[in-house]
Amino acid sequence: MKPFSDFNKQIKILENRNLTILDRKAANFALRNYGYYEIVNGYKIFLLDSSKKVETFLEKETFEHLVSLYNLDKQIRNLVMQATLEVELSLRTSLAYTLAEDFGVLESDYLDRKKYKKGKFQHKHKKYQRDFLLDMLKDIAANRPVEPLNSYRIKHKHIPPWILFKETTLGNITNFIKILKGPQKDKIISLCTGLSSSQLTPADKALFIEVLDLILAFRNRAAHGGRMFNYKASTSLSYHQNFHNEIKITPGDYRNNKGKNDLYTFFHSLALFENKAGFDLLQLCLYSIKEHDASYTKDWLVLAKEMGYPEYILKTDLERHRNFHKNYRWSYLWHAIKNIFNK
């Protein structure tokens, strides 16, 4: 049985394991508000002395280092969440537009089973994917007592797809796209990527569907508060020459499990979307890493490895980010001085 330890005892346990506490009051606050398990168990693996049989922290390691890693990961998690919300909006809009344009705005038309592929058999629900999704959507359309569904039932006597799909999850949307037939699936991929249907290759289409699963995995991880920077999704991208060349992952790297299911691959998968809001949000992760790196200068190597980032690319990106902010600060100061003298 795991015994209870109050906050002061938790701090003493850490000190007995060779961890330095620079500010006991701040440490007590962190443990009270975020929890021992979240901060210590979540990130201690990166600061432990692997040569010791008993759990011992490396010399001169601090509790503040653990908290900084925790805060960095929390910032990455929040950005992943925001980025996937942008992707979800693009997917939902494209799906609703395609169904309305091709099948109409009445549920009896755009929720007609004949218009979709069966999909995989889901043993949990004892139904094919198509039947489970369509039954769920019909039930939402008929019975869910929320706005704007209520208003549309009363005023318009039907619920168009752009209203109905507001009530679905990213997982529902992803699975619904998978059961679409060729023309509708191609249209959605075209709308999301900005490529015309004639430009899309079979490889482009396959990559897009795989990317949806990767995005969903990272979204679920973020939503449940899991550690992000070393997360490896259970779903992996196949090797796609154009995509992997673009993100500087060689076939050899791929065989060594790079460019499959890590944070670096997830970052760049969002660049496939014409709406770059999600991808741009994730670039703010570099700012968070840069801020952490200012205090813990060797951690970027650990982060590069855990995130699946090629070391030279992360180093270049961080340097570019430093120069951007340095130049931005000088530019801001120069304009402020000019404004003073121009008054």
Model-derived segments and spans:
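Low-complexity, charge- and small-residue-enriched intrinsically disordered regions
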Residues: 336-343
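Long, contiguous internal "core" modules enriched in hydrophobic/ aromatic residues
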Residues: 1-329, 337
